[in-house]
């Protein structure tokens, strides 16, 4: 025994079986080594073994695994065969035809697809999740996170090649003449009869799609010959969320590759200027994210424009830099006055935390105290409001989670908060928000009611039954290698979201013996299930892994 102590105060009721939650604080233990905790008294328990070590030693491997997950998600001819036996997939994307945004009713395709151009080469990129589709919305978010991390930590294993791979694909989506953006590759939902999409077919590895017999007019034609969907007609402008976020990714690419690959950096900067200028910021309407929109129902865009302008300001020089700095301040003000401000925290749908931080950095670097009513202090105050929202939620939860289980995307919001706290501390030059950020990260890594990490490969228990064909068909089903390391699952959701779920034929049942050994720990209306069928809790995705990368890089001190 190296230390002893008493359980903390009762934090409240979790469910009928567990009416009391008591914290165990061993933060005074600093000596590196492997430990376990023994609980004695009226209740006895023993924890799994865990490491106490330098933060870099604990978290650098998790950050590298986040990059490895992106490598696993590669699509096209240049996949990593050494990762879960991946094989080239969707090679027909090299000559994809371009289509207008189709119509949907209740999640089903209405009418036929209308061709408006092509062929275009949109092969490559990252598959968004388990369904093999590719979106500018999520791929740009992931590459922003990767490039941001690489800028701070050039030694991050595998990051340079992966960031370049993602950037090249994002550049392939922007058609300079005319100024149009491809925002999605692949059809998710067809009509279930004459036109099938990725969600209408059997469970299979991505490479299967390229081998289908799928002549024009056959139901599977668009599964093999995947459509590339264009954002609006010519001269309509680009949806501002995508214009801002892709401008940010391109500009970050220009920063990161300025010396490593000057030609790529020049292409990226040119594209960043053009797509930012193309943003449709009047009469915006429904944002373009995915088809159908319900897949990714983003509602806010001013934060994306702020982020794009801030990254351009950090990339440019002289009068051009000043112009983008004014643009960033303009959109920071617009975001602060938006009806959605104060309703969300850092995640795929709200990047204000990163945008404010990068604008603050630009103002600091260029010795600007105030611009258009925006100061470093006002940026910090806006982020304090977001963190305050989360802290109020955490005060009502026995496990101090700063988001609501019933909002879905529980893990992505927790990871976002674990990133946002240190970003705000960086602006304020304090460590005030570090403990709260650590609590959110700890929740993701196992300090939760279910006692499981939600990151594959992290901890003694983590998800084994991913809702992902690559993991399910080419990986193990018991947590031993090969596994999809670095994948992050959505985590607990509203219990009603797990009713009536099923899968098409072809999957390997997991858990092998069935059942749900974690059900006794469901509470607060939330449920977590480690089951291949349970897509709401167990389908990993790009955006959640990207947040994991940012969180683990910060925790490692990078």
Residue ranges and their predicted role:
Residues 53-59:
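Extracellular interdomain linker/stem segments of modular secreted and single-pass surface proteins
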Residues 153-161, 223-278, 282:
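A conserved hydrophobic secondary-structure block that centers on an alpha-helix together
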Residues 159-187:
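Carboxylate/His-rich catalytic cores and anion/metal-binding grooves
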Residues 1-43, 68-140, 148-149, 184-245, ...:
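Aromatic (Trp/Tyr) and acidic
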Residues 288-298, 341-347, 397-407, 457:
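Acidic, Ser/Thr-rich low-complexity linear motifs
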Residues 44-52:
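Edge beta-strands of extracellular beta-sandwich domains
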Residues 333-342:
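Solenoid-like repeat scaffolds
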């Amino acid at each position: 025994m190296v230390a002893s102590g008493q359980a903390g105060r009762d934090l409240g009721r979790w469910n009928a079986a567990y009416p009391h939650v008591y914290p165990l604080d061993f933060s005074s233990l600093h000596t590196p080594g492997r430990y376990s905790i023994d609980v004695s008294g009226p209740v006895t328990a023993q924890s799994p073994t865990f490491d106490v070590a330098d933060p870099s030693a604990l978290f650098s491997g998790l950050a590298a695994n986040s990059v490895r997950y992106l490598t696993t998600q590669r699509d096209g001819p240049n996949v990593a065969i050494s990762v879960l036996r991946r094989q080239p997939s969707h090679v027909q994307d090299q000559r994809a035809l371009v289509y207008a945004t189709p119509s949907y009713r209740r999640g089903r395709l209405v009418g036929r697809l209308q061709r408006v151009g092509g062929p275009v080469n949109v092969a490559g990129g990252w598959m968004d999740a388990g369904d093999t589709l590719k979106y500018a919305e999520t791929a740009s978010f992931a590459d922003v996170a990767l490039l941001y991390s690489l800028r701070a930590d050039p030694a991050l294993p595998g990051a340079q090649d992966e960031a370049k791979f993602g950037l090249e694909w994002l550049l392939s989506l922007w058609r300079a003449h005319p100024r149009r953006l491809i925002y999605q590759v692949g059809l998710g939902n067809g009509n279930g009869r004459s036109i099938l999409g990725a969600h209408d077919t059997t469970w299979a590895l991505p490479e299967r799609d390229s081998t289908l017999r799928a002549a024009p007019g056959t139901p599977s034609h668009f599964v093999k010959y995947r459509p590339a969907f264009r954002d609006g007609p010519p001269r309509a402008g680009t949806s501002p969320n995508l214009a801002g976020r892709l401008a940010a990714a391109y500009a970050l690419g220009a920063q990161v590759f300025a010396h490593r690959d000057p030609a790529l950096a020049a292409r990226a900067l040119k594209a960043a200027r053009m797509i930012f200028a193309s943003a449709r910021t009047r009469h915006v309407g429904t944002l373009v994210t995915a088809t159908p929109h319900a897949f990714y129902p983003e509602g806010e865009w001013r934060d994306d424009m702020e982020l794009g302008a801030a990254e351009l300001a950090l990339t440019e020089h002289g009068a051009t830099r000043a112009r983008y700095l004014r643009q960033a301040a303009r959109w920071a003000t617009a975001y602060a006055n938006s009806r959605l401000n104060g309703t969300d925290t850092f995640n795929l749908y709200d990047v204000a935390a990163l945008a404010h931080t990068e604008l603050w950095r630009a103002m600091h670097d260029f010795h600007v105290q105030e611009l258009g009513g925006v100061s470093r202090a006002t940026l910090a105050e806006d982020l304090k409001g977001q963190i305050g929202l989360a802290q109020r939620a955490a005060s009502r939860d026995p496990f101090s989670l700063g988001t609501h289980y019933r909002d879905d995307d529980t893990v992505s919001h927790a990871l976002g908060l674990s990133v946002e706290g240190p970003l705000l501390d960086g602006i304020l030059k304090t460590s005030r928000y570090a403990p709260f950020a650590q609590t959110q990260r700890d929740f993701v890594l196992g300090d939760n009611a279910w006692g499981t990490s939600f990151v594959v490969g992290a901890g003694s228990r983590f998800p084994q039954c991913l809702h992902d064909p690559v993991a399910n068909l080419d990986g193990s089903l018991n947590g031993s290698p090969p596994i999809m390391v670095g994948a992050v699952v959505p985590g607990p959701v509203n219990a009603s979201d797990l009713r009536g779920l099923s899968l098409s034929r072809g999957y390997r049942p997991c858990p092998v013996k069935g059942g749900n050994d974690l059900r006794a720990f469901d509470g607060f209306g939330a449920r977590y299930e480690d089951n291949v069928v349970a897509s709401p809790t167990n389908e990993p995705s790009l955006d959640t892994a990207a947040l994991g990368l940012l969180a683990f890089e910060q925790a490692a001190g990078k």
